[in-house]
Amino acid sequence: MLLFPIIVSIFSLIFAYFLIREVKKAPSGSGKMIEIAQGIREGAVSYLKRQYKAVAQVAVVLFFVLFLALGIKAALGFLIGAIASAASGFIGMMISTQANVKVAEAAKKGLASTLNLAFRGGSVTGFLVAGLGLLSVAGFYF
């Protein structure tokens, strides 16, 4: 019975992969647009590094507290969830910052292509969170 959630989560991750490919294939626009987008991406990466450093320190403490209070299984479950959350957040941020400039370029062609690309870029994070979360929980109990 636990095989079904694992299969669903794998499909979610595969779908996220195809969404990422679609976003990456879209044109990025002019040199100035790309330059601004790179600045936004650098700021986002800097923010995530700082945030993840602080969260990692808290996570290490919580891991040991959970280990002492509830045992290794609960502590490992927390650690797996934290890693899956960090991975989906990082990948989602990278795709979102890539999608920004591509959506701006798509806006030159019309509303339909703009919204289509924006929804694809934004939904990557959702599919990653759902897929990695479900895979982590189901895999943990498999």
Per-segment meaning from a language model:
Residues 1-142:
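Hydrophobic packing and interface segments
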